Amino acid sequence: MNILVTGGAGFIGSHLVDRLIKEGHHVVVMDNEATGRRENVPAGALYFQGDVANIDDLERAFKNDLDAVCHIAGQVSIIRSFSNPLTDLRTNVQGTVNVLQLCLKYHMPRLLYASSMTIYSSASPLPTPEEAPCQPISYYGITKYAAERYVRTTAERVDLDFDFRVTCFRMYSVYGPRQALDNPYQGVLGIFLGNLLRGEPITIFGDGEQSRDFVYIDDIVSAWVSALGKPATYGRIFNLGSGHRLSINQLGDFVLAAFNHTRSDYSLVYAPARPGDQRQVQADITQARVNLGWEPKVSFETGLAETVRWAIQQHGNDLQTKIAKRAI
């Protein structure tokens, strides 16, 4: 298959590109490199630098006889969605509408969309099924839900003259290698790892008893690849998480232990809670098990160890790059 991956230079997208190429697919990548890194994209992919919110940029990638689109590109920071809501709206909603417009123009048979756990309310039952009410409490969650509705409504249009098969993945807290270590606005595990590597205090916002459902990147990629040609996923929404909860306090302790520290010898501080922070999060992954045949295989302990090994190496590489640039 010829597959376009938007956001393919980013954390999740680049791992998906790697797997697709290994399985023999031809992959087209588009990324604006706002948070993605060009070096994440394997040599076997056709690369376009551009913004999904610019339909002309996007159409360059669409003109490659595509069989499917994996739309992952987006603004993914809850905090930045509050400080810059128009950018959040432009990237997540307008960008998705642009993807849909071109899917219609080119009669795209298949679209997979990266939705988010943030569309659920803090009062959702635990574990949370896909049928739970969607009442996002952050601007980011609002834009992800709006984009998801655009995707599903477009696929259900009675005036379409072709089969447009879509699947939406509500992804939980994805972690693993290539996660940002220097972005204080997204990815709590990456933030904590970056803090440790730079010798900075770990900051927990709120009381730390809020929970997250952490799922390893390899498991996420397996779900996406499996869904591409599986009719049971057409027109469906799936939660992608581990099905387990971990408090932010527990996460802090795990990360400290990974670096042979405890709270007694490393600074861990608390700060006021931030807006848009869901209190308790846990995915019900029954539908993914039944219809996708998917099961997360990587335990948090194993995934954390792999991520820490990568982070230590990446931090060293980044330091060497900075030193080399200063010497020029």
Language-model segment annotations:
Residues 1-174, 313-314, 325-328:
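N-terminal Rossmann-like NAD(P)+-binding domain of SDR-like oxidoreductases, especially those catalyzing
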Residues 81, 132, 161, 166, ...:
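A conserved pocket-lining segment of Rossmann-fold NAD(P)-dependent short-chain dehydrogenase/reductase
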Residues 122-123, 139, 180, 184, ...:
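Active-site "substrate specificity/gating" loop of NAD(P)-dependent dehydrogenases
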Residues 146, 150, 154, 188, ...:
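Hydrophobic alpha-helix immediately C-terminal to the catalytic Tyr-X-X-X-Lys motif of short-chain
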Residues 197-328:
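C-terminal substrate-binding subdomain of Rossmann-fold SDR/epimerase-dehydratase oxidoreductases
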